[in-house]
Amino acid sequence: MLLLWVSVVAASALAAPAPGADGQRRGAIQAWPDAPNVLLVVSDSFDGRLTFYPGSQVVKLPFINFMKAHGTSFLNAYTNSPICCPSRAAMWSGLFTHLTESWNNFKGLDPNYTTWMDVMEKHGYRTQKFGKLDYTSGHHSISNRVEAWTRDVAFLLRQEGRPMVNLAPKKTKVRVMQVDWKNTDRAVNWLRKEASNSTQPFVLYLGLNLPHPYPSPSSGENFGSSTFHTSRYWLKKVSYDAIKIPKWSPLSEMHPVDYYSSYTKNCTGKFTEKEIKNIRAFYYAMCAETDAMLGEIILALRQLGLLQKTIVIYTSDHGELAMEHRQFYKMSMYEASSHVPLLIMGPGIQANLQVSSVVSLVDIYPTMLDIAGIPLPQNLSGYSLLPSSSEMFKNEQKFKNLHPPWILSEFHGCNVNASTYMLRTNQWKYIAYSDGASVLPQLFDLSSDPDELTNIAAKFPEVTSSLDQKLRSIINYPKVSASVHQYNKEQFIKWKQSIGQNYSNVIANLRWHQDWLKKPKKYENAIDQWLKSHSDAKTI
């Protein structure tokens, strides 16, 4: 019944008249007569390409479509690091990954770090958050940490279960992801009990785990999340015939980093076309369930009379490869993994507007402060999205080009054996690795090769060189890679010392246990050799 109400919601006018611009610095004090409420919904692993054509044809997402019709869609929004914790650290801090040293899912922000929500609270906003946060240090499994720390070791081990699908027994089951639905209910109840009669403006955050794959218990307790799980109810929202089977390069022709990722993700074996299509169908169905949770929030705002007083933002920490480039999960700069949804609607936001310029998740921080009329810190990596989306600035050309014509994304975690850096511009995607010399770069022309099947770095050396110079002007990536390399060794040594005589047993039974236990001495020796290289013997 929930989805039938979309037409009712669509009938209400969302955009309040925006006051005329006076040419001054943007801010809520000028843009809104009263400080608006703000609601941010962040899902996990949602491919941003599903929010616009042609990706939008494969699955029904009525509430995302509602936000598109009544708000602004950013067609080229990207994560600043395609993995949970570092991506969220960038979003909550407004700073690039290397500036906060949020290297992996274990190393994020300090628990006491001042986020945009903290700043808004100090300026009179009532704040609340529910669900997945995952931007501070100290979380995730031992396996996840050790795999990230040892990615430079000269071995190749499967770290994930083979991707698979699992259908819920009850055909009509709607609430498949129980934890997310409970958190959605908590957010709705908070709106009803706490926000509806409050004289304070509020900022509410809801973090969802969907459409992240589920754990795979059949692969053993130490394997990760490789199961795409849903019910027939959600599968009916998927246009099966519209599902595209991605093209794969032969294993022998893959970029070496891609091969490492595919192998560690357990994707180098044989997959039938039916398997691939089912994985993608189940993933899209999980996206449909995510959309319904977003819908619960939108409907609650409408029912409480808050919809015309609230800026609603929807995005995701990263995407999901769903078997593109012979991989699932994220940890990649390919579009399926790095491209995220980003939609904004509410009073003063332009309706039915599509923005094609590149933006990224570090832009959330300044946007939040800008909505609240709070002066923006000068050290932020991000830029406010209001000049691109607000009614107030639609005729103000001098505000249109404040955001630079590029975004930076970087990755330093597990399942990838080299620090990775992406510079995305209007046409080009340039990907550099490690020190810039030991691993060949990649260059894709997304205007002619949207599926990123042809690396043209060698074909266009001038473009490659120019983009590399631009990247180095933004980040000294060889130096950052060296810092991460040293961090990984130091953290591994601390961990090894902390478990003492149990080391051999513990490391053998992490997520890679199926491969490790075949030749445990070989892999221990490989780690020893890695630790000895460029390290202080006394430390080891």
Curated annotation (Swiss-Prot):
Q: Report the catalytic activity.
A: an aryl sulfate + H2O = a phenol + sulfate + H(+); Hydrolysis of the 2-sulfate groups of the 2-O-sulfo-D-glucuronate residues of chondroitin sulfate, heparin and heparitin sulfate
Does the record bear Hydrolase in its keywords?
A: yes
- Which cofactors are required for activity? Ca(2+)
Q: Where does Ca(2+) bind?
A: 44, 84, 317-318
Keyword entries, A-Z = Calcium, Glycoprotein, Hydrolase, Lysosome, Metal-binding, Secreted, Signal
Annotated residues for binding of substrate: 132, 255
Q: Which locations, inside or outside the cell, does it occupy?
A: Secreted; Lysosome
InterPro entries, per database record: Alkaline_phosphatase_core_sf (IPR017850), ARSK (IPR047892), GAG-degrading_sulfatase (IPR051849), Sulfatase_N (IPR000917)
Positions carrying 3-oxoalanine (Cys): 84
* CDD domains per the UniProt record, alphabetical: ARSK (cd16171)
Q: Please state which protein family the record places this protein in.
A: Belongs to the sulfatase family.
Function of the protein? Catalyzes the hydrolysis of pseudosubstrates such as p-nitrocatechol sulfate and p-nitrophenyl sulfate. Catalyzes the hydrolysis of the 2-sulfate groups of the 2-O-sulfo-D-glucuronate residues of chondroitin sulfate, heparin and heparitin sulfate. Acts selectively on 2-sulfoglucuronate and lacks activity against 2-sulfoiduronate.
- Protein name as annotated: Arylsulfatase K
Which source organism?
Answer: Bos taurus
